Amino acid sequence: MGCDGGTIPKRHELVKGPRKAVKVDKTAELVARWYYCTLSQEKLCRPIVACELGRLYNKDAVIEFLLDKSADKTPMEAASHIKSLKNVTELNLADNPAWSGDKESKKGDTYDDIQSARFICPVVGLEMNGRHRFCFLRNCGCVFSERALKEIKTEVCHKCGVPFQEEDVIILNGNKEDVEVLKKRMEDRRLKSKLEKKSKKCKSAESAAQQVTTEDSPGPSKVKNSKDCIASSSGEKRHIIFTKSSDDRSSSVPGKVNKASTATKRSIADTATRNLRHTNLFTTHSSAKRPKEECSNWVTHTAYCF
């Protein structure tokens, strides 16, 4: 049987089978991972930072996420491993001289080249557009292509000369296997830092305890002598310290004058002359005393008798 117009329908047009899985466009996925921030989904602009798993972020978005970690604003899966700014590294990127994306005005009749990248590898010159594998160093933040590190094998950064190890190399936007390896390294690194902090705290506590014990322990001058300690009838000990005055030592030596005693005598005489005006004001002074002839032979309530 045919339909109107003489058309004959087929089976696949009438019977609906299972839906096919939606395939994501690879170019669109690369653009989203290499040109946009993982947190805010905005275009990447300097300063650009990368986490220990190789994901790219805007630094402003990371700071906002750390200040307000609400699940409504940012996806927690993308930044759940970021606890502070120490967990991210600011990237030192090399600009592409042939890139003019923001300078030219984009119109509907112009062709937008997605493959052109804003940054390139400073050694080989490959564009950082997702077609080639790129990595950065945790020590300095310089970004290179993986090909450059394989072709020129060194233990020093090609750009700034900072030494690095194999563990410091982190691949940007790697596949699932790369992310698993980087995650394991991140966990080991954080566990190692925690153990180092604990060991430092234990060492500081031990050093403080040693200082306290050294301050409390008596030195050679503070050791008690058995001759100086005399046991009393009540069981208590009294400490008797015998000291010799400096006057006795100086007097025992012939031909030497005691300078301390003369200094004290002079000081007393000086004070007596200075206080002469003040002593005249009191009745105990010699000028205020009456002679015996003027003194009365009886005692009154306020006897002025001296």
Curated annotation (Swiss-Prot):
The keyword RNA-binding does not apply. Keywords: Chromosome, Phosphoprotein. Transmembrane segments: none annotated. Residues 235-250 have a biased composition (Basic and acidic residues). Belongs to the rtf2 family. PANTHER family: PROTEIN C20ORF43 HOMOLOG, REPLICATION TERMINATION FACTOR 2. This is Replication termination factor 2. It comes from Gallus gallus (Chicken).
